[in-house]
Amino acid sequence: MVTVAKARRSASPKGRILGTRVPAFFPAKGAVSAIIFGEAPGPNGADKSKIPFFGDRAGRPLYEALEADDRVRFTRPLDQVRWDGAALVEAGIRPVVSDVALSNAYPVCPTDDGEHFRAPTKAEMSSPENVRRVRAELAKARRRGLHSVIVLGKTADWLLGTHLGLRDDPDIAYHQITHPSPLGLMGMAKRAGKGVRVSTMKDEWKRKFAEMLRSKP
């Protein structure tokens, strides 16, 4: 998943970006109490796996937190497979979620040349097509009992919280949390004070995320 708020270009080290349109990932059945929005599919993760966050660097702590909260299981063990979208697909591994849905503020890994990824622009995110998509995903989740929306990072917060106004929705517990990428966790560690380890912030991120999952308006 893209981890910067500005359109800074970064090379994808594992081949060309496919430009895969990654749909929201819902449970096959049952309630959906929370929906989680990231920024966009990452070049080595969801762009290859076609599942939000799956194989993205920031997706690892997210899926670990969901697994600890009994919100996800995997079709095969993960311990022998590299955390990478293409590798996970090749190994036949898929997540099976319950009570939670996963999506992104923008459904395609943004790129200008097929090799470098960047953050989605506000114009891209606020396009009529993209807004219709996000509203449809939210409506689907509401029909299944949605009461919590969690966004990762400032870019997704701009679309969901500001542009679509969910921050002021009385029927939704709306939360923004730091993006759990290495850069995001390093920022948390710096803000926490000198000597605080990134691994400690990863655990703290998971704790806060679990609280948000269970929150209600």
Regions found by a protein language model. Give the residues of each.
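A polyampholytic, Gly/Pro-enriched intrinsically disordered region
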Residues: 192-215
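A polyanion-binding, active-site-adjacent surface
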Residues: 1-148, 155-164, 172, 182-186, ...
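Short hydrophobic/aromatic-enriched beta-strand-loop microsegments
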Residues: 169-179
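Solvent-exposed amphipathic alpha-helical surface segments
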Residues: 69-73, 167, 212-216
